[in-house]
Amino acid sequence: MEQAPEDQGPQREPYNDWTLELLEELKNEAVRHFPRIWLHSLGQHIYETYGDTWTGVEALIRILQQLLFIHFRIGCRHSRIGIIQQRRTRNGASKS
């Protein structure tokens, strides 16, 4: 008969602690890339929609992750990650 493998991995933090730590890291990163008024408005929207609940925390984490992913994917001035098109001269040579 099959049995589930024993948990041999490292001990994990409690979910609530890990979630709050992740939210704090995302907020710190978001402040570096977006206007504070946008982030404040997002926080107000989440609070009005979900109140002070874990569902609201999870929604805020998900939205911040999506915003940062798209921001980096499009091209952030602070990052080398992204798809910013470089101008090219004839013969495909780039300006230096």
UniProtKB/Swiss-Prot annotation:
Phosphorylated on several residues by host. These phosphorylations regulate VPR activity for the nuclear import of the HIV-1 pre-integration complex. The modification Phosphoserine is found at residues 79, 94, 96. InterPro entries: RetroV_VpR/X (IPR000012). GO terms for biological process: DNA-templated transcription; monoatomic ion transmembrane transport; protein homooligomerization; regulation of DNA-templated transcription; symbiont entry into host cell; symbiont-mediated activation of host apoptosis; symbiont-mediated arrest of host cell cycle during G2/M transition; viral penetration into host nucleus. Its main location: virion. It holds the Pfam family VPR. Residues 1-42 are annotated as: Homooligomerization. It comes from the Viruses. Keywords: Activator, AIDS, Apoptosis, Cell cycle, Host G2/M cell cycle arrest by virus, Host nucleus, Host-virus interaction, Ion channel, Ion transport, Modulation of host cell cycle by virus, Phosphoprotein, Transcription, Transcription regulation, Transport, Viral penetration into host nucleus, Virion, Virus entry into host cell. The keyword Phosphoprotein applies. One of its GO terms (cellular component) is virion component. It is found in: Virion; Host nucleus; Host extracellular space. During virus replication, may deplete host UNG protein, and incude G2-M cell cycle arrest. Acts by targeting specific host proteins for degradation by the 26S proteasome, through association with the cellular CUL4A-DDB1 E3 ligase complex by direct interaction with host VPRPB/DCAF-1. Cell cycle arrest reportedly occurs within hours of infection and is not blocked by antiviral agents, suggesting that it is initiated by the VPR carried into the virion. Additionally, VPR induces apoptosis in a cell cycle dependent manner suggesting that these two effects are mechanistically linked. During virus entry, plays a role in the transport of the viral pre-integration (PIC) complex to the host nucleus. This function is crucial for viral infection of non-dividing macrophages. May act directly at the nuclear pore complex, by binding nucleoporins phenylalanine-glycine (FG)-repeat regions. HIV-1 lineages are divided in three main groups, M (for Major), O (for Outlier), and N (for New, or Non-M, Non-O). The vast majority of strains found worldwide belong to the group M. Group O seems to be endemic to and largely confined to Cameroon and neighboring countries in West Central Africa, where these viruses represent a small minority of HIV-1 strains. The group N is represented by a limited number of isolates from Cameroonian persons. The group M is further subdivided in 9 clades or subtypes (A to D, F to H, J and K). Belongs to the HIV-1 VPR protein family. Homooligomer, may form homodimer. Interacts with p6-gag region of the Pr55 Gag precursor protein through a (Leu-X-X)4 motif near the C-terminus of the P6gag protein. Interacts with host UNG. May interact with host RAD23A/HHR23A. Interacts with host VPRBP/DCAF1, leading to hijack the CUL4A-RBX1-DDB1-DCAF1/VPRBP complex, mediating ubiquitination of host proteins such as TERT and ZGPAT and arrest of the cell cycle in G2 phase. This is Protein Vpr. It comes from Human immunodeficiency virus type 1 group M subtype B (strain 89.6) (HIV-1). The gene is vpr.
